[in-house]
Every structure is written in C-alpha cells, then in structure tokens.
C-alpha cells in the first residue's frame, strides 16, 4: 500500500502557503492567530537553494 504523504514543494505552497491563506477569510484568521501567538513562521516557506 502506498503511503499517504508524498511531499512536493509546489503542492505544499499551493495548499498551505501564505498566498493560499490570504485568499480566504479562514486562512486570514489562521495567519492572524499565528501573528498573535508570535510564531516565527506564519506559513510554510519553500526556500530556494
């Protein structure tokens, strides 16, 4: 049986990235909650080498 988590940076950014979060009201709430809590990373960032 194939495992469910097959990591891909593109999909990660599209579904959980900052732009995706800002696109919906719920996502904006997530970003604001993480800001309030003082998180260093608000959304998963994909770094270039």
Curated annotation (Swiss-Prot):
Superkingdom: Bacteria
Q: Which UniProt keywords apply?
A: Ribonucleoprotein, Ribosomal protein
Q: From the record, give the cysteines joined by S-S bonds.
A: none
Q: Which GO terms describe its biological process?
A: translation
GO molecular function per UniProt: structural constituent of ribosome
* GO cellular component annotations of the record: ribonucleoprotein complex; ribosome
Concerning NCBIfam families, the annotation shows: rpmH_bact (TIGR01030)
Classification via PANTHER family: LARGE RIBOSOMAL SUBUNIT PROTEIN BL34M, MITOCHONDRIAL RIBOSOMAL PROTEIN 34 FAMILY MEMBER
Q: Which family does it belong to?
A: Belongs to the bacterial ribosomal protein bL34 family.
Q: What is this protein called?
A: Large ribosomal subunit protein bL34
């Amino acid at each position: 049986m194939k495992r469910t988590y097959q990591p891909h940076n593109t999909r990660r950014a599209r579904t959980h990235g900052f732009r995706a979060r800002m696109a919906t009201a719920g996502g904006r709430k997530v970003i604001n909650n993480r800001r309030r809590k003082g998180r260093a990373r608000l959304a998963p960032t994909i770094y270039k080498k």
